[in-house]
Amino acid sequence: MTPVFSSRFPKSEVPEWANRYSYTQGGDDDGRVLEIGERSRRAGYFTRDEFLEVCEWKTRGRPRRHYQRNSEEDVRRVTAMALSSADEDKRIWTLVAPGLAGVQMPTASVLLHLASGDPRNPLMAPQAYPIIDFRALWSLNWEKPRRDTFTFWWAYVQTCRALAVECCVSMRDLDRALWEYSNQNQNKAQNTCSD
């Protein structure tokens, strides 16, 4: 079954929620990882240090020891294969473990988000990749499946691309809006449902 996503908030509010976004780590919301993405996009791969920094940003260090098992050679080789593939299925699954130790679909989606077209450019939204995250999924009224599948991933990508185009925002701004809406509302909604 292909999932159907629908936003929990009006599409007209996407820019407003994007502007409220705050995921500060060390004083920088996402500027550093966007710089890494630009460099990786030009080079066609991530270096190990860049990979580790992006993984740290996404996961706040939870599976750090797994990420650190990846060698410089492995990170460059695997990310180059993923970023150069024309096959969408291979593009995402090449990055997921055992491709890169510790990497699951959410982290793989960040690597694609940052290095496949400029995620800050609204004109690139039809080719850009969203970040798959429980917060963004909640904002789109969908739960993360028990098992990651390409069907789920691709439906999410297509939904986010269409939503970004419809709202005239970049994929980065759409991601920020979905994340921030959940950040400010998900726990409140769950608390009122349990009363």
Regions found by a protein language model. Name each.
Residues 58, 82-85, 115, 143, ...:
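Alpha-helix boundary/capping residues
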Residues 96-97, 112, 163:
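Broad structural signal for hydrophobic residues in well-ordered alpha-helices, predominantly aliphatic
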